[in-house]
Structure formats: structure tokens, C-alpha cells
């Protein structure tokens, strides 16, 4: 067995700071063991290496210069002999009494057992990273040294770490290291947390040894779920609620038959006609001495566009008078706006085109006279009705036409409302009407001229009244001849000439 000094060197103790300065000289055999253990600047070997001084490669030659076994005492306590502390013969167990607080062993702390991590069971040993490949041995016992005399997993780390090849006297110049310097982190077995947990020494400062980090807890590890058994039955899924008509609604629907009668339907038609006979409620527009008197009063019967035809010059001359009538009678203008909206949504294709030209020509007249475009105006305020009616009637045709021309779809044209999307008369009508309807819906006080693509100081010269009707009828006829689809030809023809030919098969009425 090794001597006390050999044991202290094995534990990394600086003998200059220990309490064994005044130990008596040891015999030559002890000095020889000391030379063998201190033959290199590295840490000494483990207890197993010390018990077997001759390794597999044969005995190591003894160096010529022998280090003295006893060093002089420190200058701060000259002449004070230190009591030699006997080395314990066995490692202390958990129930053994602790040494005296003034002894070297109390400062060093309990030694860790020289056991390999393979002896530790559980999941910690399995989670340890694979050991680093050791460097080839250089002969003698140096090739068999492991770490700091321990049989831990990093047996070769002591050879590759430059900090462990430093002289023992430079490791802790301020005195002996604390006893808990090489203890593992809390809850970690010996040797589990030492690999890769040391922090590098601060440059130019004293080396400190902190507490090692413990391995990660098992709760932080990604654990894959167990594979599902394909033979296991699938979990039951709740059936969605049935989408049915509730009983109360069914009773309401059937109760219509109890109230439906021919006399009741006739009375409903009579009351509606009486309301429409005087839609303004006795407060119509003042039409005395007005060139617009025939159209300001209510009229029965269908609308005939030819009887209301006016030239652009007439509109420029008498348009401001009608504009002032709308602006000076807000209640009558509100009633006229509601009635116009209902009429526009029931027009056929030719009448809808005439309404589009009416709206754009009215805007051109206002721009010509520098009049504000008012959303409360009955003509401008009902632009959305013109747009909806035209889109409903032309949608089946425009799906094929716009795609063949490489233009945006109808819905995209109306939602984007960009002047740059205007490429022909069809896109012009829908983009301009969509921009006007959007301003009215937003409730702006006035609509600027730029909404119609008119710059500052410009007039609406690019639009001629009647271009909507003439242009859209032209593209219907042109595309009908160019497109090879029979369905497209039938659709375009029925839009222009809509008399009934085929499609309605019966009329069923069990109530009256």
C-alpha cells in the first residue's frame, strides 16, 4: 500500500499547504513509490495501479532525481511541529464517525469510490454519452492511467485536456483546494456529471471548481408514444347533430294554407297599387315651370326609353335645373331614390344598359358644370342597383368572354375597383360603377372626380353617352361569332333577345 504522502499526492493536495510539513523522513521504499507516482506532471494513478506497480508493459524506470519526501515548513509558522495524521485504513462508510475538524481528511472530504459508470444501474447510465476514444499509450503505466486515479468513464480525458497536464503546484496557488471541489452535482452518482461539465478557467484569474451539473431529468426527455396496435378497435366518434327543420317551423309552414285565399291575395294587390298611386305621400317634387315636370311626377305603366330620349346638348342645358331640384328637396329625393332602386333591379337587359348610360351621362354633366357628385342624389345613390342587375344578367356570358380576353374575372373586377384593370367597354362599365357604389356605401359627403378617372381640370371626354349599350351589345355579338361553344352562343343570344322559348315547364299552386 502507498504511504500517506503518496495518498495525499494521489488526492491532488499541495504539500506546501498541508499539515504534514514536519513529518519525519520516510524510508527509501516510500521515496521510491513517491518517485514512481510523481514521474509525470499528470495526476497519479488509481488505487489499483498503486497496488500493481508493474503494468502490462513492464516496470517503469526510476528517475535519477529523487524528490525529497518532506518539505520545509511554511515561514508563517516556523518551529511549530505538525502532528502527523494517520491515514485511515478503510474508506469511511455512512455510519462511521467523521474525523476531527482540524485534520486534513476533513478538509479533503470523503473520497469517491473508484467504480465505473457501468456499475451504476438505472436510466442514468444508459443516457450517458459514449466514452471518448482514448489516445494510444506511450508505454509503462502512463497508458493505463485514468483521469484522476478514478475508474470513471473519462479515462482518456486526462491525457487530452491541457489543464490536467499543468504542474500540480500551479493549480491552486492560494492554498489547498476545498474538499468539495470534485464532488458531483446534487443527486448525480459519482462520475456521471463530470464529463463535459467543467467550466474553463478565467483568463489571468484563479482557477475555481464549481459544482458539476446533474444529468437532465427524465421528464425533459422526448419520449416517443408507444406504437398503436392496428388490431385495436377505432375510438367511437359521436355522430354529428342531425340537420333538420324543427317541428315549430314545420307547423308555421303548414299554417300558410289556413290563411291563403283568393280574396286575401286580391286584397294585397289592391293595397299595394293604392300605395304606388301616390308614392311621395302628398309631398312630390315641385314641378311647376320645370322642363322636367313629366318625369318628376308619378307615372303608371311600363317605361319606354324612346319617349324619354334627350340629347347631350339638352342634358347640358337643363341638367343643372334637375340637379338643384334633387338638392333642394331632400325628403322627395329620398323617396325617389328608394323607388328608383326598386325599378332598376327589375329591368331587363336593354333597360339596364340604358340605366348605366343614364348614370354615367349624369356624372359627366355634373363634371361639365363643376357640380359636386352627391351620394344623396337619386341617380348617383342608386348605382349599386344598376351594377347588381347588370352583373346578374351578364355573368354567364362574361365568364367566357373575360377569360378569352385574358382579363380579370367579374368578381375580381368589382372587388379590386382599379382603373388599371379597364381594358374595354365591359371592364370600364363594371369598374366605374363599382367605384361609385363603393363611395356611396361608405357614406362620403362628396365623390371626387378621380373616382371616374377624371383628373384635375379635365372633363369626361373619353365617355360618350350611349357607349354602354352600344359597346356591350357589340361584344355580345362579336364573341358569339368567335366562340366555338354552343352554350356561349345560346347565352349571348338570349341576353340580347330574351323572349321566352324554352325552360319553364309547369306552374303548380294548391292554395289558390
Curated annotation (Swiss-Prot):
Described function: Multifunctional regulator of the expression of viral genes that contributes to the shutoff of host protein synthesis and mediates nuclear export of viral intronless mRNAs. Early in infection, this immediate early (EI) protein mediates the inhibition of cellular splicing. This results in the accumulation of unprocessed 3'end pre-mRNAs which can't be exported from the nucleus. Cellular protein synthesis is thereby shut off early after virus infection.
Effect of residue 137 to V: In strain: Nonneuroinvasive mutant HF10
PTM comment, free text: Methylated within the RGG box possibly by host PRMT1. When hypomethylated, ICP27 is exported to the cytoplasm earlier and more rapidly.
Source species: Human herpesvirus 1 (strain 17)
Segments traversing the membrane: none
Protein name: mRNA export factor
Compartment(s): Host cytoplasm; Host nucleus
Disordered: annotated span: 1-243
First and last residues of each zinc finger (CHC2-type): 400-488
Record: residues binding Zn(2+): 400, 479, 483, 488
Assembly: Homodimer. Interacts with host RBP1; this interaction facilitates the RNA polymerase recruitment to viral transcription sites. Interacts (via the RGG box) with host ALYREF/THOC4; this interaction recruits ALYREF to viral replication compartments and probably directs viral mRNA to the TAP/NFX1 pathway. Interacts with host ALYREF2. Interacts (via the RGG box) with host SRPK1; this interaction relocalizes SRPK1 to the nucleus and seems to alter its activity. Interacts with ICP4; this interaction modulates ICP4 DNA-binding activity.
Primary location recorded for the protein, binned into one broad class: host cell
Chain span(s) of sequence motif Nuclear export signal: 5-17
Amino acid at each position: 500500500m502507498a504511504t500517506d504522502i503518496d495518498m495525499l499526492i494521489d488526492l491532488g493536495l499541495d504539500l506546501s499547504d498541508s499539515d504534514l510539513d514536519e513529518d519525519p523522513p520516510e524510508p527509501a521504499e516510500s521515496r521510491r513509490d513517491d518517485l514512481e507516482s510523481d514521474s509525470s506532471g499528470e495526476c497519479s494513478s488509481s488505487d489499483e495501479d498503486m497496488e500493481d506497480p508493474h503494468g502490462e508493459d513492464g516496470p517503469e524506470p526510476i528517475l535519477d532525481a529523487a524528490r525529497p519526501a518532506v518539505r520545509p515548513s511554511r515561514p508563517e509558522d516556523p518551529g511549530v511541529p505538525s502532528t502527523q495524521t494517520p491515514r485511515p485504513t478503510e474508506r469511511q462508510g455512512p455510519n462511521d464517525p467523521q474525523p476531527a475538524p482540524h485534520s486534513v481528511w476533513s478538509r479533503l472530504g470523503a473520497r469517491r469510490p473508484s467504480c465505473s459508470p457501468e456499475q451504476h444501474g438505472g436510466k442514468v447510465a444508459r443516457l450517458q454519452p459514449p466514452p471518448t476514444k482514448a489516445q494510444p499509450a506511450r508505454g509503462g503505466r502512463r497508458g493505463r492511467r485514468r483521469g484522476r486515479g478514478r475508474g470513471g468513464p473519462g479515462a482518456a480525458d486526462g491525457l487530452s485536456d491541457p489543464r490536467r497536464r499543468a504542474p500540480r503546484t500551479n493549480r491552486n496557488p492560494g492554498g489547498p483546494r476545498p474538499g468539495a471541489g470534485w464532488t458531483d452535482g446534487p443527486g448525480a452518482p459519482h462520475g456521471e456529471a463530470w464529463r463535459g461539465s467543467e467550466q474553463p478557467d478565467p483568463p489571468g484569474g484563479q482557477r475555481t471548481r464549481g459544482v458539476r451539473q446533474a444529468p437532465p431529468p427524465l421528464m425533459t426527455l422526448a419520449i416517443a408514444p408507444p406504437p398503436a396496435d392496428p388490431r385495436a378497435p377505432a375510438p367511437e366518434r359521436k355522430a354529428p347533430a342531425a340537420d333538420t327543420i324543427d317541428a315549430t317551423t314545420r307547423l308555421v309552414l303548414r299554417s300558410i294554407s289556413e290563411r291563403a285565399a283568393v280574396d286575401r291575395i286580391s286584397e294585397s294587390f289592391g293595397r299595394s297599387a293604392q300605395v304606388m298611386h301616390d308614392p311621395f305621400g302628398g309631398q312630390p317634387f315641385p314641378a311647376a315651370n320645370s322642363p322636367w315636370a313629366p318625369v318628376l311626377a308619378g307615372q303608371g305603366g311600363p317605361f319606354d326609353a324612346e319617349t324619354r330620349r334627350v340629347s347631350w346638348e339638352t342634358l347640358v342645358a337643363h341638367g343643372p335645373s334637375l340637379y338643384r331640384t334633387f338638392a333642394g328637396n331632400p325628403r322627395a329625393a329620398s323617396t325617389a331614390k328608394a323607388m328608383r332602386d326598386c325599378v332598376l333591379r327589375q329591368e331587363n337587359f336593354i333597360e339596364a344598359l340604358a340605366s348605366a348610360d343614364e348614370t354615367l351621362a349624369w356624372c359627366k354633366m355634373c363634371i361639365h358644370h363643376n357640380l359636386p357628385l352627391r351620394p344623396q342624389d337619386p341617380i348617383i345613390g342608386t348605382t349599386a342597383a344598376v351594377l347588381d342587375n347588370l352583373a346578374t344578367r351578364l355573368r354567364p356570358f362574361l365568364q367566357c368572354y373575360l377569360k378569352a380576353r385574358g382579363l380579370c374575372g367579374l368578381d375580381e373586377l368589382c372587388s379590386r375597383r382599379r382603373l388599371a384593370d379597364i381594358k374595354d367597354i365591359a371592364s370600364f362599365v363594371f369598374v366605374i360603377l363599382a367605384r361609385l357604389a363603393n363611395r356611396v356605401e361608405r357614406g362620403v359627403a362628396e365623390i371626387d372626380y378621380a373616382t371616374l378617372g377624371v383628373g384635375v381640370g379635365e372633363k369626361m371626354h373619353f365617355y360618350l353617352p350611349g357607349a354602354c349599350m352600344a359597346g356591350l351589345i357589340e361584344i355580345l355579338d362579336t364573341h358569339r361569332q368567335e366562340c366555338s361553344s354552343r352554350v356561349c352562343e345560346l347565352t349571348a343570344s338570349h341576353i340580347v333577345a330574351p323572349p321566352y322559348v324554352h325552360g319553364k315547364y309547369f306552374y303548380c299552386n294548391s292554395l289558390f
